[in-house]
């Protein structure tokens, strides 16, 4: 059976893994790194992904970072005259990870398990699934990142215990409490903030640097795009440095220019100052942590293990806050950057049957309901309900002879409908005339194992039914997704063709150089006609290289290659003939100089 790969599609970095010999294994990228920056850049029609895209972000304004923060919204980014949705940009990253896995496995990969933050709403989950489809992947399961981390951690653990997963990534924060035992991974509660992550810690440093520089030089670096990108890179590096040292030097020469000439940014940032700048962010993570414990009906002493996930959990202040709250040190036996992808690979193994005796019971992170009279949200499914699940409730009309009801589907925890997230709307029509309160309208919610919602409404009097599968709020239809799949495939083909063209041009250019060298080295050994023929073929290649016709380059290169081969063959033949002639002459000369000599046999006996 074909492998199902596990993908951690992160805000800052992404990672791909697969089950090999009963163990999840991270697949390194072409650069040899185990994680790939979630960065996409466009340059003259060419797409760059990962490390190469991140490296040129300072000079290329068409660089897209942290697109995950916009999943499930109608946000679009315009690049080189084309609008890209977050799904399309994410699909480009997924395509790279897919190709990475195919290179490693030596076979085509078509199926994947993709992780999302536990606190992602339905629209964000659907958008992630769409991104996978656009990338040419059949997304077999969407699972929550903390749950994936628990799968990777608990695969070989036999004993029953309760774990708290604290997941602070580049752009999102989740905390989940799970009970593990006998191969059952049961999520008891989950909470989080899908707008909080390492990017926000970077931004605090950037704001500090901008403010200090403005105070010293009167120039606002926030208005300079190139300076801002340099500041972002420096802030990210400083944050990482401060996880291991107590202070770090930030040095950005020629950051901008003033009236007197170039200006440089030189600043020392201490860990104490960094902790002060980011104290509010660390505290923001503690509110969901407290809520998750409360929802689980637990106190910190009931937690057996704390597992930290996500690169931002390397920040000492974050580790201290978690330890102070729980009274326990975090478990150090997992790599926070890789554990989620490893868990996704385990889930892939569960689906293919490679991993046995593992049952995953996840929960819905937010309550689901509909708007009822008075703009109130009436909940049908409470948060932290184990999924998949189904729940129905009977409602009625609010007015006499009401011919239709609007079903406004909501997700959230607030009592008023307007304060919650709208997942979708649909209408049940042709309700027979009746006094208000008489018609019986059954509303049913279904949540599948991916956490994606289906809602139906049925008039119990007429059995007329209307249903809706909640689409991402970006409004992508099946036709939109199909078109994006075709575009992605076409772009992949175009990328391959562009690579082939570059290789062909390099080969042709190298052949021109080799021809020049051969003609020069052989000199008088080539007759004028052959030299002229080689020059003409070489000129044809040079002309083709100046144009855009790939076939013309290939044809001219092949022609020059043939001419050069014939030329060198003729030279070798001439050299062979000359050598043979020289050897013959030498042999003849030796015969002429032979002298006849008389000899007399001497008997040794006579000399004794």
Curated annotation (Swiss-Prot):
This is Chaperone protein DnaK. Coiled coil: none annotated. It comes from Exiguobacterium sibiricum (strain DSM 17290 / CCUG 55495 / CIP 109462 / JCM 13490 / 255-15). Keywords: ATP-binding, Chaperone, Nucleotide-binding, Phosphoprotein, Stress response. One of its GO terms (molecular function) is unfolded protein binding. Pfam families: HSP70 (PF00012). CDD domains: ASKHA_NBD_HSP70_DnaK-like. Residues 576-590 have a biased composition (Low complexity). The modification Phosphothreonine is found at residue 172. Belongs to the heat shock protein 70 family. Acts as a chaperone. The keyword Phosphoprotein applies. Residues 575-608 are annotated as: Disordered. Induction: By stress conditions e.g. heat shock. Residues 593-608 have a biased composition (Acidic residues).
